[in-house]
Amino acid sequence: MLHLHHCVSARSFRPLWMLEELQLPCTLHMLPFPPRALARSFLELNPLGTVPLLVQGKAPNEVRMTESAAMCQYLAATHPEAGLDVAPTHPAYGAYLNWLHMSDATLTFPQTLVLRYGRFEPAQRQQPQVVQDYTRWFLARLRAVEAAVAHNEYLCAGRFTAADVAVGYALLLAQHLGLVEQFGPATQAYWQRLQDRPAYQRALAAQHQAALAQGVSPQPSPDIRP
C-alpha cells in the first residue's frame, strides 16, 4: 500500500496527480501547511518536515521518498504499462529526464521565493524586489515550455508522460500566483489541456475531500497568509 503525506496544492500534488493517472490505491494523509510548524509529530516520519513524503511497503524493503519529481519518475517507471514513462532506449528519454528535473529545479524554485517573500513572511520581512525579480526569472524560463508545446500537445515523446505532471504542477503554482495571463498562448493552451484531464480533476477533488474528512483546512497552501 502506498501512503502519501500531503498538503493541499503543495508540491505533493505531483505524486497525488500521478496516483490518479495510474489509478493506484493510496492512503492520503493530510497535513496543515507548513507541517514542520503545525504538525510537529510529522518530523518523526520526515525530519525535513516537508511534503511530499511517499512511503511504500515495510522494512527492510520500505520505499521512502521526499522529492516530488522523483516520485513522478518512480511511479511511472514502476508501472510502465500505463504509458507515462519513457524508456531509456527511446529517443526522447533525455528530454523526458530534463523536463522532470526542470519542473522543480527551474520552474518551481523561483516561485517558492515569490511565495515566501510575497505571502508567507510577516509584512516586515517581505521583499517586493525578490518577488519581482523571481517572477521575471520564472516567466523567462517558461519560454522553454512555450517552445516545446508550440507545435506539440505535450512536452516530449509525442504523448502525455510523467514529465507533464511534474511541469503541470509548476503551472498550477503559477496559477495561484496569478501569472497565467503572462503565459505564452501555447503554454496557456497546454495548461488548459492538463486541467481538462480527468485524473487532474480527481486529484483536486481527492485532496479537498480528504482535507475535510481529516479536519485540515482545504485552503490551498500557496494561498495561505500569515
Model-derived regions: residue spans:
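Short Asp/Glu-rich motifs
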Residues: L38, R193, A213-Q214
